[in-house]
Each structure stands twice: as C-alpha cells, then as structure tokens.
UniProtKB/Swiss-Prot annotation:
InterPro entries, sorted: EF-Ts_dimer_sf, Transl_elong_EFTs/EF1B, Transl_elong_EFTs/EF1B_dimer, UBA-like_sf
Function noted in UniProt: Associates with the EF-Tu.GDP complex and induces the exchange of GDP to GTP. It remains bound to the aminoacyl-tRNA.EF-Tu.GTP complex up to the GTP hydrolysis stage on the ribosome.
One GO molecular-function entry: translation elongation factor activity
SUPFAM superfamilies referenced in this protein's UniProt entry, alphabetically: Elongation factor Ts (EF-Ts), dimerisation domain, UBA-like
Name of the protein described by the UniProt record: Elongation factor Ts 1, mitochondrial
Keyword Mitochondrion: yes
Record key words, sorted: Elongation factor, Mitochondrion, Protein biosynthesis
Pfam families named in the record: EF_TS (PF00889)
PANTHER family: ELONGATION FACTOR TS, ELONGATION FACTOR TS, MITOCHONDRIAL
GO biological process, one term: mitochondrial translational elongation
Native species: Trypanosoma cruzi (strain CL Brener)
Record family assignment: Belongs to the EF-Ts family.
Source species taxonomy: Eukaryota, Discoba, Euglenozoa, Kinetoplastea, Metakinetoplastina
Gene Ontology terms: cellular component: mitochondrion
Cell compartments where the protein resides: Mitochondrion
Amino acid sequence: MLCLTRLRANVNKVAFMEMVKDLRFRTEAPIAECGAALKETHGDVEKAMEVLRKKGAARAMKKRSRVTEHGSVVACVGGLFGAAVITVCSETDFAARSAQFQNTCARVKVALQRKIIDSKGDVLTNPTEAHRSLVEATAEDIRSSIAVLGENVTIKSVESLRLAPHVAEHISIGSYTHGSLDVPDVGRIAGVVAVSRLDPTKEVQASTLTDVARHFVASSGAEGNYAHQNFFGTEETVGQWLKRHGLCFSSSLVVDFGKEPITHTASQPRNAVKHPEG
C-alpha cells in the first residue's frame, strides 16, 4: 500500500513538472513562478497563464521608471515606402544581448514595417507620431519582455530616412546592421539608404543595396563630401561606384546606439533651374 502511494505521488509530481515545463514554454516566465501559478489555479494551465500575465503586467508598471541605457538599434525597411531605424533599450547589457530582448526587437521591427506599408510611408512623415504609434502597437509585447527579463524595456526612438526631394523617383531602399547577434537587422549600428535607379526598368540586387548601406555604416564618422570618399573595399569613389551600378544617391541614415543619428542627403545640382514663385 505504501509503495502504491509513493508511486502515485511520483506520477503526480512528474505530471506537475510537465505542466510547469509546458507553461514555461508558452509564457517564458521563470520556473518558480510557473509552479506557483499552477498551484494557485489547481493545475489549470490556461488560468495559470492569466495569473502570470497579470503579475507580469504589474511588474512592468513598477519597472517603467527605471533608467534604460543599454540596448540595440533596428534597421526597418518598409518595402519601397520608406525606412527607419528604431532604438530599443534595456537596463543592462546582459539583458540587451539575450535572445528574449533580441527577438522582441525583431517583432518591433515587423510592427513598424506593417505600419509603413499600410500607410504607404505616411507614418514616417512625423517620427514623433510614428514612435507613439509603435509604442502603442507593441505595448503587450514589451510588457511580456519586461516580465521575462525582470527589467525595464523601452522603445526610445524612431528615426526616419528622409529622401532628397530632387532624387525621389524610382527609389530602392536597403539596410545594413553591424554588431548583430544572429537576429537579422538588430545590432549596435544600423544604416538605411535610398538610391534612385538611373534606368527605372532595371531592378537593383538586394546585395547591391546592402553594399551601399554597409559603406555608409562603415564611413559614418568620416568627414567631407561622401561622393568623393572611396567606396568601402574598393578604389572607386562613392560617385563612381554608384554610377557603374546605374544608381544615383538620394539619402542615408546611420544610427550608432547611444549616439546622434548621422544623415546624408544628395545635394541639389548647381545648375538646377529654380522656378520663380507666383
């Protein structure tokens, strides 16, 4: 009889641990909290998930005032409609390098991409409004990340790529991220670039756009006219390289985490005709 009782106890323990494992997989909450939530709800996994969600939201509210000085920048390209760089912050570098944080950044990028495409780029005309809208759209995801990481996570800013008005047709947009931890478009430095196709019937290879964005990331601290710089890894100037690839530069945006954005915009041609007003 005693052996049978012990056997049942062991079976119940194994079943309980399986439920804890399942709950942790579904919520990413700490094991101890999963166990406590299951005991509180008498083994009801769905109710336990709700308990963990409420506790996570409560902790998130308490942590929102904490200073966030670490994090990543995220390159976000919304098809042909525009691009931006998002800055997402955490309290510690340890959290910023975690898979949870990095994957949260990737989901934030997808949320902004949808907004760019759905609005045909209009959302980027006002970066402050774009930031507010993105924070609102990802609030639940950010709260979940705070609950898992145990520290504050914030979307600090959205910087928009602005096209040169006189080079705004037949545009292709590319991006490059430096210092990535295996999550695409998330890293320490992110750059987005817009170029115009000299022959609108020809498409630009994705690798070519990446090369252009990589150049501006690599030379973001350089002084002088970008067109006269050597293109990254070549003996050609930027202007020569772009011309050989049938491209005309419009604009670039590079954000190094924690630093001011660096932008370049194509200069207005000196011989451009100015039409009198009125």
